[in-house]
Amino acid sequence: MASKGAGMSFSRKSYRLTSDAEKSRVTGIVQEKLLNDYLNRIFSSSEHAPPAATSRKPLNFQNLPEHLDQLLQVDNEEEESQGQVEGRLGPSTVVLDHTGGFEGLLLVDDDLLGVIGHSNFGTIRSTTCVYKGKWLYEVLISSQGLMQIGWCTISCRFNQEEGVGDTHNSYAYDGNRVRKWNVTTTNYGKAWAAGDIVSCLIDLDDGTLSFCLNGVSLGTAFENLSRGLGMAYFPAISLSFKESVAFNFGSRPLRYPVAGYRPLQDPPSADLVRAQRLLGCFRAVLSVELDPVEGRLLDKESSKWRLRGQPTVLLTLAHIFHHFAPLLRKVYLVEAVLMSFLLGIVEKGTPTQAQSVVHQVLDLLWLFMEDYEVQDCLKQLMMSLLRLYRFSPIVPDLGLQIHYLRLTIAILRHEKSRKFLLSNVLFDVLRSVVFFYIKSPLRVEEAGLQELIPTTWWPHCSSREGKESTEMKEETAEERLRRRAYERGCQRLRKRIEVVEELQVQILKLLLDNKDDNGGEASRYIFLTKFRKFLQENASGRGNMPMLCPPEYMVCFLHRLISALRYYWDEYKASNPHASFSEEAYIPPQVFYNGKVDYFDLQRLGGLLSHLRKTLKDDLASKANIVIDPLELQSTAMDDLDEDEEPAPAMAQRPMQALAVGGPLPLPRPGWLSSPTLGRANRFLSTAAVSLMTPRRPLSTSEKVKVRTLSVEQRTREDIEGSHWNEGLLLGRPPEEPEQPLTENSLLEVLDGAVMMYNLSVHQQLGKMVGVSDDVNEYAMALRDTEDKLRRCPKRRKDILAELTKSQKVFSEKLDHLSRRLAWVHATVYSQEKMLDIYWLLRVCLRTIEHGDRTGSLFAFMPEFYLSVAINSYSALKNYFGPVHSMEELPGYEETLTRLAAILAKHFADARIVGTDIRDSLMQALASYVCYPHSLRAVERIPEEQRIAMVRNLLAPYEQRPWAQTNWILVRLWRGCGFGYRYTRLPHLLKTKLEDANLPSLQKPCPSTLLQQHMADLLQQGPDVAPSFLNSVLNQLNWAFSEFIGMIQEIQQAAERLERNFVDSRQLKVCATCFDLSVSLLRVLEMTITLVPEIFLDWTRPTSEMLLRRLAQLLNQVLNRVTAERNLFDRVVTLRLPGLESVDHYPILVAVTGILVQLLVRGPASEREQATSVLLADPCFQLRSICYLLGQPEPPAPGTALPAPDRKRFSLQSYADYISADELAQVEQMLAHLTSASAQAAAASLPTSEEDLCPICYAHPISAVFQPCGHKSCKACINQHLMNNKDCFFCKTTIVSVEDWEKGANTSTTSSAA
């Protein structure tokens, strides 16, 4: 192996030591006196060297081995103890007892030190116990859930409900609930968080037991422990499902040693002394330089020392590493000796100096150690470094994290070490994503935030979507000063965090370097393979928590990756003018169908990939010149047939881990083990990716490219970046795409992975972290409420004043804590830079979707998550980053809103998208989009043909599709224009609960007259659009209201039973949903009648009369059910059941009233008469229902004024804040008109014999006869029937025509059955 140093390379074989005492003199060695001085300087530098090591005999390379042996001799008292130590029983190497010392199901790491709970409350103990003396061990907390950590005896018996501390002679500390346990429980200690270290101490001389958290003593927890014959205590833990920790019994240096206490596992004392002496010699080499010309030794700074190929220096180092190399493979020595040495270099020198020394050290390791030795050393070094970074406390200047990251960067700058770590360690063995995470402090006082942010402040209102912001009082001078002081503190914190983030970005820049391909594959392409596997594990294991990267890590990883990605993207643009800037980035559509990037089993827009390859193979050939290998299609078909049989061989290929279970379970080893650093070595099975069978000449447009499947590991740089005749990832460019590449193909794959990361867990975590801001708002509201009560409380009530003062103090202290923690969250998660990253990702997705849409049918190959990320990232920008940062301040905000609106409008009903979930997401996003003025205006800005196409899709018949969301969209376009439909909170709730701040709230109305006009134009076009749409709306209204009535009957029956009954909350929710659907359907009918009244009132249209009669029938049914005296509806409303808050008279009656007023008051006289006659002709019509609207029990006598309404009754007049005076006047006019018309109709009506009534409805006289069968009914019944069915009611004969029929008439008029 070769190593680089001072521009020269040296072969390790030339300087291998030999045992031959008679070897010849090596040429190039300096003269004897200088050699003696040099060797004495190097090997006498150890402070602990025994006298024998410094003899008067001149030192040379012949007697140096003997001298080294004497130097490394260790006194007898420092030798490791191989037998039993007094006070301890068990193996000298302490691990978890996975063979018999456990209860429940647990997953144990390969090193038998990390454990994950895999059952309700599993327990496990160690293999070694203690009965005398003072002992301790450390537990690294990987998750902050329910765990009980401590000690137990071998006689303790545990189960799935009782763990450590729940039995006699077992003692535990629980930082989740902040308690100590020994059969009973009391408060103790502090709350722990992920990243903390708990030290468990037991003093069996005094019989006491205590705990420390991050080196700070929590005090004595238990006294008077049972001691004596047969009493020995084991370290033990009980943990709930998915919780994880790692133990350190002494196999590594303790992070927080305690004087007088001994770790359960003895350190390798003798080897530690030898390693420290050898390190002293090594440091001496780096500080001395030979001057053979002058014959003297020169002192040299380590950062300026260079290996110049001098044989004397090389042989000296070879002797040192002959003894040092085996020691550097041991975990304890790497962390205690090598890590401390390297950290000292980083802490004392500048970054440049530290980098120089670390680079020299790594060069020497690779030169003088065997490959397997240096690889083990580097692996242990990175594991220790990661552990130190993750479990370091947060200090105000983040100095510890900065030092660990600087050392990581220095190591990764060494090309050979970087490639080895990237290929074998970073993603395979380590949780390397931890390096990009900045943990949030649970205890702000320990993190120094009180000094950094001495003044606290919190906003007084919420600006999140869906929450009505309260009127903000004018800011006082004192509040303004507090806010500005708080913002200055936040700025100081943000600057310190930015230093750490920049170091993390530097790490990723090193991993994404593609210019280090001398003698091997460049780092970027190794990273791509590992990164894709990382994504596969997290995508395929979403239900298996141990296999997932924690979402808080993923958020930080995504932001650092975007920064590094954009750096390289713009760097490539600087040297390639034809490429694009990162601001114009997108993923070309051919990446989704050429198979060069593996999307695992993620759903495509058009369904499964195997299905798309079969159904769209002709389109692939014609548009992209791609032919799928027939063998590929055949193997895919066989995979589909054998899908149920796949898991067995897949699991057989995975290595088993140590399982702490009662019997053998065929569990695959989890990918993210509980250890802070250990992961799975062999995580993945082979995954498929399609690669070119590379042609050797340019392709003509008529030639096709046949593709075949390769595993991810088999891809080469050429498969990704392409070559002269190979487009790599961009194989199969459609004609719509430009010929010039956007950037390097490898960066496109990284960008694709970043989008996938956001979809996997980042969005979910962004929503979760908003909880801190919500807590601040809730406590601020509680504090204001308490202060108001203090001001109103009489001074004589000192007891109440004392309680209120106490509450005020508690709320103030909690707000101080939360406001500082919120500052940390805003700096690490919701800063302006993070917001720009998410915004950039949104724009990338929008451009990707737009380019994919242009490919026609090939758009179906796009993974669903691109649409999901576009929807969710917009939601995050709008809801999660305020009020500190506003989306409206982002560059190109209006244009982005419009582009997203165009995508939602076009694709919510796109036939190329088949997935139910993604179609629902698109529909819900569009429904949310039209609720808010800014986004609704964006919908109105999209091209007119797209707007019309969107409305046409909304007006499609409701059958055979999810219609509820469509209906909500139409309602939101209307809200603010309907009768009494301008409220933001349900008026009937405000009348009963004036001060309830938790009432359901709605957005302020923002109707769209433009989209309403498109709807009117479309309903007037063609003879079938309006009838089919309205018929489906009437059908759904009939269903929804009937279901609602049936459910409230069941609720009423349950409430009237003598025994105590609880109505199922799910049933109440469904009932309320049916009511809300009924109201929304009525509002859509109101909008339709208002915009296009002729659809119902122009009887020259063949379906108008039928639609009007159906409408009148349903309106009468609703009115009769809701307005009857002491009826079912009244009784259920009076119950005020939780979950039925929206069910009341007002919402449904004003919707019905709006329709009736439009039909009977606002239209021309002729149309009003038609509507009146149809309404009165319906047998269910009752004038009393119309009187009910104005609070009148009976209709008034003709010519008399309306009496004052009864306050106990429902009346629209009681809602003057929501119903205008003009609207009330129209209702009164409608009542007067119907009173007069019903009286005239009653006087003019003639009795009808039963034989002449329609045999279907028994409400109207027979007026139509069917041909050819001759059966009869009224026109309303047969017209409604023919909308859905062409068979006769009675004989099932196909109806050819319907003829008018009148008793006694000799002629008839024929009309078409259609």
Curated annotation (Swiss-Prot):
Q: What's the PTM story here?
A: Ubiquitinated, leading to its degradation. Deubiquitinated by USP19, thereby stimulating CDKN1B ubiquitin-dependent degradation.
Q: Where are the transmembrane segments?
A: none
Instruction: Indicate which residues the UniProt annotation says bind Zn(2+) 1.
Output: 1254, 1257, 1274, 1277
The pathway this protein participates in, as annotated, is: Protein modification; protein ubiquitination
Q: Which residues carry this modification: Asymmetric dimethylarginine?
A: 683
Q: Where does Zn(2+) 2 bind?
A: 1269, 1271, 1288, 1291
Q: Which InterPro entries match?
A: B30.2/SPRY, B30.2/SPRY_sf, ConA-like_dom_sf, RNF123/RSPRY1-like, SPRY_dom, SPRY_RNF123, Znf_RING, Znf_RING/FYVE/PHD
Task: Write down which residues bear the modification named Phosphoserine.
Answer: 675
> Which PROSITE patterns does the entry link to?
B302_SPRY, ZF_RING_2
Give the enzyme's EC designation: 2.3.2.27
Give the record's biotechnology entry: The WILVRLW sequence, which specifically recognizes and binds NFKB1 could be used to generate a tumor-suppressive PROTA.
Q: Name the chain's protein.
A: E3 ubiquitin-protein ligase RNF123
Question: What's the source species for this entry?
Answer: Homo sapiens (Human)
Name the gene.
RNF123
